[in-house]
Amino acid sequence: FMASAMKVIEIYYARPIITDREDAVDQTERLHGDVEFKDVTFKFGKHIVLDNVNFKIKAGQTVAIMGETGSGKTSLINLIPRFYDTNSGEVLVDGVNVRKRKLSQLRSQIGMATQDVLLFSDTIDGNIAYGDSDMSEEDVKHYAKLAAANEFVEKMPDGYETIVGERGVGLSGGQKQRLSLARALAIKPAILILDDTTSAVDMETEKYIQDSLRNLDFPCTKIIIAQRISSTKDADMIIILDDGKITEMGTHDELIAKKGYYYEVFKLQNDGF
């Protein structure tokens, strides 16, 4: 009991490390969605996770990130909403260092859906509309449809009023991922970050989701971590990470021509090509 009580006290008195600077930019208008990494190095302790990373993403582009487990993909995307700070270099959104932006304003315009999904103990409706109690039922269904979730939700006895999360019904990994994607889309983000979000869905559902993402009714920069070539081949730019460094960068055709890591993955997923 005492150990649990001490843990509660520790959490209660904890203070966030990442906070707004006194000179933080107050920008209430919608972001365009330009993202730039400029000489970014990031460490966990003494371990270098990202090593002098440089790239630019123009607003509205789709960029895919690939690499082996532990190559730094998730750490990279977590720097954009400033979950961590870089050790050196800059992460810029619309030309402004994220350290100089107000956290609430930055994060409110970044939608994230990850492989490991957290669902709140609430209705499906409440999970999708999380943070916006005024969202209409029509809008909730719209984003569920974009994420290929509407069909399985409507088959449930209580539909969108079904309770999920710790005290709710059990959902498959693919169903959870689709609800997480619907929640990320529902805020109409200027920047959408997907971390292996379709890893647990079948190929047909993945294709449906890709079509939805290509035809969103709002401007959006999309950054997608994926292991399937089917998820990356149509991206405007593909970034290959290896041990925290960018080893390849270009379009699908350009990387196939280089015959490096991307080409080997392509061959493997296409039965030797």
Question: Positions of the model-derived regions?
Answer:
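Cytosolic ends of transmembrane helices, especially the final helix of ABC transmembrane type-1 domains
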Residues: 1-11
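ABC-type nucleotide-binding domain
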Residues: 13, 18-273
